[in-house]
């Protein structure tokens, strides 16, 4: 009986030790390449890459892989692909990927979607702002809590 108690205590101690070491080392149980394991460092890299294209012209139906010009979904597809995340080509299809996120729980790097049916996507960068592209001016930073974006916000997805 004493042996069983010691064996059970040993298992509990081992689990507690592993859990504490994971907590303090920053190691997650979910692999970092899983679409649902949010990574703030990867999100910052995605945002920095997206910002490199500020001012890049908008062109509806821009081809995948081009960085000369973008439409909204080719932009998000292009930026995320640089970090190993393959998004579908169209915004309505991108809205089906990853994990649903409420507007109040947005984190930098989340995809934000607009209109019904969905036909616009941007990358949330924090503080109520997104980087996206449309019309004259091309890639830009917009406030999701004002004007047309506030009125037409639909959903968000986390793919990082």
Regions found by a protein language model. Name each.
Residues 34-43, 55-108:
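Catalytic cysteine-centered active-site loop
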Residues 2-8, 26-41, 45-49, 85, ...:
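Aromatic- and glycine-rich peptidoglycan recognition patches
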Residues 10-15:
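Sec-dependent signal peptide recognition
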Residues 16-29:
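Hydrophobic core
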